């Protein structure tokens, strides 16, 4: 959309979650500019920002990602594992909605299944999230964001019961 409109743009990509490299801070900044002169100016400014902030980033995570993406067998394995995780998280979203309904939570919970990714905004407020932590040992941030990837068949009922208790 931006490219076809002739707009310059930047895209920040993180590989931390999709490669389970949380402590490595692996990512990329891709920049599209109108011409080579503008690209050179942007690159110059980015180099200044990089030098000021961290100078030499760690390379281990980047090397892992590069190896996986450029080795066909490893890339295929990674893509299959990623697809499996996406499916599991999608199934957990559905199971979470079903469990919350069984726990007596009223209303439309379809927002949980319509969201994508490892996290979901639960609609819980800061006080409710603090109660989940202190009373039930269930952790999320005060904005109500919870990690759906951490929900599984073994803890689903306990999570749903705890959410019902704090509402």
What is the meaning of each model-derived region?
Residues 1:
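Active-site-proximal segments of catalytic enzyme domains
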Residues 5, 98-102, 124-167:
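PLP-dependent enzyme catalytic core of the Aspartate aminotransferase-like
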Residues 6-7, 24-26, 114-118, 135, ...:
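Active-site lining segments that contact anionic ligands and/or coordinate catalytic metals
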Residues 7-14, 20-79:
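Conserved core segment of the aminotransferase class I/II
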Residues 53, 57, 84, 88, ...:
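Catalytic cores of large soluble enzymes that bind and process phosphate-bearing ligands
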Residues 57-59, 111-114, 140:
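A structural signal for short secondary-structure junctions
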Residues 77-135:
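Conserved PLP-binding catalytic core of the aspartate aminotransferase-like
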């Amino acid at each position: 959309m931006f490219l076809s409109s002739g707009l310059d743009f930047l895209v920040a990509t993180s590989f931390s979650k999709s490669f389970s490299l949380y402590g490595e801070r692996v990512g990329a900044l891709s920049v599209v500019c109108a011409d080579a002169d503008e690209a050179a100016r942007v690159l110059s400014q980015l180099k200044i920002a990089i030098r000021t902030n961290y100078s030499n980033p760690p390379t281990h995570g980047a090397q892992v990602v590069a190896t996986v993406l450029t080795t066909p067998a490893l890339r295929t394995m990674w893509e299959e594992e990623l697809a499996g995780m996406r499916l599991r998280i999608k199934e957990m979203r559905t199971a979470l909605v079903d469990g919350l309904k069984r726990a007596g939570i009223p209303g439309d919970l379809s927002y949980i299944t319509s969201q994508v990714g490892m996290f979901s905004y639960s609609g819980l407020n800061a006080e409710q999230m603090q109660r989940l932590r202190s009373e039930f040992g269930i952790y999320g941030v005060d904005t109500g964001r919870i990690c759906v990837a951490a929900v599984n068949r073994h803890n689903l009922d306990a999570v749903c019961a705890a959410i019902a208790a704090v509402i």
